[in-house]
Amino acid sequence: MTLQYFSDETVNFRTPAEPREGEPFTVRFRVLKGLETTVSLHLTADGEASSREMKPVREEGIYVFWEAEAEGVRDKAEYYFITAAEDGTVWYYGKNGLSQMAAEVQPFTVLPHFSVPEWARGAVWYQIFPDRFANGDPSNDPVDGEYTDATGVPCRHAAWDEPVTAGDFNCFYGGDFQGIIDHLDYLKELGTDVIYLNPVFVSPSSHKYNTQDYEHADPHFGVIVKDAEGADRYGIRTTSKENLEASDALLAKLIEGAHSRGMRVVLDGVFNHCGDFHKWMDRYGLYRKYTGEVGAWWDSECRSSRFFRYLGYHEYESWWNNETLPKLNLDGSKELREEIFRIAEKWVSPPFNADGWRLDVAADVAHSPEANHAFWKEFRQHVRAARPDALILAEHYGDASSWLSGDEWDSVMNYDAFMDPVSLFLTGMDKHSNGYDPEEEGDGALFWDRYSKASARLPQQSLQTALNELDNHDHSRFLSRTNHTAGRLGPLGPGEAEKGVSKAILRAAVVMQMTLPGAPGIYYGDEAGLCGFTDPDNRRPFPWGKEDTVLQDFYLNAVRLHKNIPVFRDGSLVPVIMDDDLAVYGRFLGKEAALVVIHIGTEPARLRIDLSDVTGAAPHAVTRVLHSSTLACSLGRKNVPTPMGTVDLNLLPQSAEIYVW
């Protein structure tokens, strides 16, 4: 498709792309040559609206670029473009494209005080679920029956390759910090920039979203110096000073090891709720017995009783009515808020020096939107004061724009503008494998509609740092979605998640992950060929010694392309063809450009693409740097002449290709 009008928030169309307070900036608007129109800029700066004429300043191939200057702003600017044809037709252009009414326009934004860490833009993430990545120290492994709680008795899997079971939430494989340390070189070789660790603080579960102690790393991941037998084992292991200090030191060593290899580490912050084991609640009396601390379960007048909302005797507000997850009363206790801020500062400060926080269910924190926003504003101030380049990334489903103005979150886990539209287009499956819709699969126009609307809600800073994952600990493995099997582990069994999967479709997904705007995130084991339904089956142990090495090599090279081709980090994105079984898009930065072709049909297809649709000026030749299909996979470079400015493609089934010029 040849776009008649185009602009965005990249450096291609705004200079500087992110103006600071009071800094003048230039905006540009691209118009198809031959359209008889005038263009004006409608600007609202610090609440004051104005309009000004734009001027055509240069031509590039089939396009004319119009420009206007804007004065610096103090707090915020919004703008959109107005085109007026000779026949009186008026169009309005904003982040959501063309509109016939000004009220429908989603304006471009300038946020002078919104600064995200430079290292996070386009960074390649690797997410690790610690219990399932690697067991580097069997001496710290949980044992069968180490404790008993409302969810049952924990178990230790006898073998690393034992299948996950439906009731696996309290079962352990023994993965730990030492296992991660032992494989830091593997992560570096893969191209990892950021290691994202699922929760690592003291907790009785394998997932550790039911925090027991925010102050310390879990000794089952760290070091057990002091141990006991029988009923005292869990209490001694998780409350003794020797174990906690040694485990904290090992986590610091892990982070230091990552830093020495040029990688960052982001921790998982679960501040909406804690666990009923937490010393502030202490439902099972561990801290009362082993440290002398008294929790709210035992004393309704103790300091931490105000950290929860009580509904009656031993009845408290919990997250989704799960009694093992008491909800923290953050808007009702200033003391609790200060505790959380101190904890957040602690882990991004020496000697730990974590590089930021991923925030669990961040929109659920507190009990009102006002209290939620107030909390995250304070949280950001504390974390950035402790570490100015710390990243604050939220788990969020839906429109996050109200948190993305520069004083709360930096960005989000990108469900709306990546995981959802990509999964539905490539597989017809939702991210939980709850159902298969053949009408969704391969609908390129619907994919682009979903993607463009969701990405338009993100400021450019947030879009570049949004975590683009195909799957994670909460959702089915992408590779399993390719077989169109809807269901869960319990009824179906683990084998059904592995039957008839398409690694060609997975490779196409990886190509999209590495070439669309944002920060691509690899969930541990995806690169090795792990399958699995949604949790707990998506948390299978990493298959060390049984990896799909061909797939690993593909990931490694796709990551290199993402990192070595600047347009994939900073460039503009334009749709070229969005049709049945096709998603073709271009990225460009100045005169450098790339074309990405995704064809998921099961039959070969022929396609002619006019390359001037990307940048305006068509090249005389392009270089293919990646090709993948059901029949072949090539990561070598191949020069392709384009004497007429077009490229003729013979697309193999379920193929993905990248061309650069």
Model-predicted segments: where are they?
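C-terminal beta-strand-rich structural cap/linker in extracellular carbohydrate-active enzymes
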Residues: 33, 124, 639-661
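Glycan-association/targeting regions that enable binding to alpha-glucans and other polysaccharides
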Residues: 1-122, 126
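Conserved alpha/beta catalytic core and glycan-binding cleft of carbohydrate-active enzymes
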Residues: 119, 276-289, 351-353, 376, ...
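Short, solvent-exposed turn/loop segments enriched in Gly/Ser/Thr/Pro and often Arg
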Residues: 130-132, 195-207, 268-278, 360-365, ...
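Substrate-binding/active-site clefts of carbohydrate-active enzymes
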Residues: 130-193, 200-351, 379, 385, ...
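Conserved, mostly hydrophobic/aromatic
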Residues: 29, 128, 187, 197, ...
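Aromatic- and carboxylate-lined catalytic core of secreted/periplasmic carbohydrate-active enzymes
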Residues: 543-576
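Carbohydrate-binding surface patches
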Residues: 16, 26-28, 576-616
